Amino acid sequence: MALDILIVDDEEDIRELISGILSDEGYQTRTASDSDSAFREIEARRPSLLVLDIWLQGSKKDGLEILRIVKSRHKDLPVIMISGHGNIETAVAAIKYGA
């Protein structure tokens, strides 16, 4: 069975790009555009990997807050954080939260 990867990003083009690349490599992918849809997807079926954008415009929670909550519920769920606008402080926070 292929690994199930959940991709969370507010930009549809980025979600589709990452999903397409991973699907071409044989992975099963799902996408979410904000915190609410991400939590719904995770609770409906826990993914094998979470690819999570740090800045989610229009979302109730940003990627770091989603990471913190997800790791409190699913400690062993691997998470890869992505961002087009990262900085050292944000990267350190993501590592501290378990990414």
Give short role names for the model-derived ranges.
Residues 2, 46-48, 72-78:
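His-Asp phosphorelay/catalytic-motif detector in bacterial-type signaling
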Residues 3, 11-30:
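Two-component/phosphorelay signaling modules centered on CheY-like receiver
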Residues 6, 31-49:
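Acidic, metal-coordinating helix/loop segments flanking the phosphotransfer/catalytic sites
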Residues 10, 81-86, 96-99:
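Conserved active-site segment of CheY-like receiver
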Residues 15, 57-59, 83, 87:
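The feature encodes the CheY-like receiver
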Residues 35, 53-67:
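Conserved phosphotransfer microenvironments
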Residues 40, 62-76, 93:
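Short amphipathic alpha-helix used as the core "switch/output" element in two-component signaling
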Residues 45-56, 80:
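Active-site beta3 strand of CheY-like receiver
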